[in-house]
Amino acid sequence: SEVILGKDKKIQEVELEKLLQSSNETVSLLVLNQLLEVNKNSKQKSISFIDQLLNTKKFSKKNIKFLKIKKSLLVFDTATEVEMLNLIDLKSKDSSFKKMSFEIMYDFYISKKQNLKANDLKRLIDEN
């Protein structure tokens, strides 16, 4: 990893993209974080990397939720409510990310000036 990070940005990105397809879940997630950092000015590329991982179907349920939350933060400004609800799991009772999911949707509703929905979520957040 350190060898890759010391190289030219384009070469670095190509080599990281190869590693992204690793069969090792941990390696893929660590590489994703590096790719997101390298491409922090390109939301589309970052979303594409997350989609690649989501489409491989090689991750645990917990990591799939984690990837979807990452994606929801990247698409936050342009997403529709349906897109956000498809990414954020508000129904799961045992989610490790339940409170965070509620808070992201709360912020989404506030940003879209949907105050009634935001207030409903705020009540649920405060109850938990």
Task: Show the residue positions of the predicted features.
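Soluble extracytoplasmic domains of inner/organellar membrane proteins
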Residues: 49-128
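Extracytoplasmic/periplasmic/luminal assembly and interaction segments
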Residues: 4-59
